[in-house]
């Protein structure tokens, strides 16, 4: 897995395109509560339990999610 590079978000709000890039890269990251322009990006553990979630428009959403991606994210192979 040394050739796999994590996909991260900008530290602030993020776009749907950025969220889709992350959900494509990680098996345990999903888009939920989709309201069109606003949605939550959710990280779940291997058992399906919620680890963290943020609305895409929150001022520090990406920063919070990136820390959980680093520790909880499961990259697709």
From Swiss-Prot:
Protein's name in the database: UPF0401 protein UTI89_C4989
Pfam families, sorted: DUF905
Signal peptide from the UniProt entry: none
Family, per entry: Belongs to the UPF0401 family.
Gene3D superfamilies attached to this UniProt entry: ykff protein like domains
Domain of life: Bacteria
InterPro entries documented for this protein: DUF905, YkfF-like_sf
């Amino acid at each position: 897995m040394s050739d796999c590079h994590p996909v991260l978000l900008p530290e602030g709000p993020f776009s749907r395109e950025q969220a889709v890039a992350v959900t494509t890269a990680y098996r345990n990251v999903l888009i939920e509560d989709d309201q069109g322009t606003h949605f939550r990006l959710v990280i779940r553990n291997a058992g399906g339990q919620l680890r963290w979630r943020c609305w895409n428009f929150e001022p520090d959403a990406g920063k919070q999610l990136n820390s959980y991606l680093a520790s909880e994210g499961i990259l697709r192979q």
